[in-house]
From Swiss-Prot:
GO biological process, one term: translation
Keyword Isomerase attached: no
Family named by the database record: Belongs to the GatC family.
Matches recorded under NCBIfam families: gatC
GO molecular function terms listed in the Swiss-Prot or TrEMBL record: asparaginyl-tRNA synthase (glutamine-hydrolyzing) activity; ATP binding; glutaminyl-tRNA synthase (glutamine-hydrolyzing) activity
Protein name, per record: Aspartyl/glutamyl-tRNA(Asn/Gln) amidotransferase subunit C
Domain of life: Bacteria
Signal peptide positions (record): none
The protein's role, per its UniProt record: Allows the formation of correctly charged Asn-tRNA(Asn) or Gln-tRNA(Gln) through the transamidation of misacylated Asp-tRNA(Asn) or Glu-tRNA(Gln) in organisms which lack either or both of asparaginyl-tRNA or glutaminyl-tRNA synthetases. The reaction takes place in the presence of glutamine and ATP through an activated phospho-Asp-tRNA(Asn) or phospho-Glu-tRNA(Gln).
Record's keyword terms, sorted: ATP-binding, Ligase, Nucleotide-binding, Protein biosynthesis
Gene that this polypeptide is encoded by: gatC
Length: 95
């Protein structure tokens, strides 16, 4: 895949970046180099390589999530000027 000058201008427009005519050719070259590198990465044979999330082994095991209500509702609304059933009460501000 190759990026032309029109594509560079379109990308700049979509990104809301002001690009002068003098800046288009260098940007075009940079984008083409990036795409060439990505194509190189796509050509690498990774069959047999196990997917990983980190290059270093995990020292800590992940724990299962436990969903709770937190148990802090009373402490949270304790200092509120007005509260009811563990909810903050605020004056009506919109008619």
């Amino acid at each position: 895949m190759s990026v032309d000058a029109q594509t560079v201008r379109r990308i700049a427009h979509l990104a809301r970046i002001a690009v002068s005519d003098a800046e288009v050719p260098p940007l075009q070259d940079e984008l083409n180099a990036i795409l060439a590198f990505v194509e190189q990465l796509g050509a690498v044979d990774v069959s047999g390589v196990e997917p990983m999330t980190s290059v270093t082994p995990m020292a800590m095991k992940q724990r299962d999530d436990a969903v709770t209500d937190g148990g802090y509702a009373r402490e949270i609304v304790f200092n509120a000027p007005l509260s009811e059933d563990n909810y903050f009460l605020v004056p009506k501000v919109v008619e």
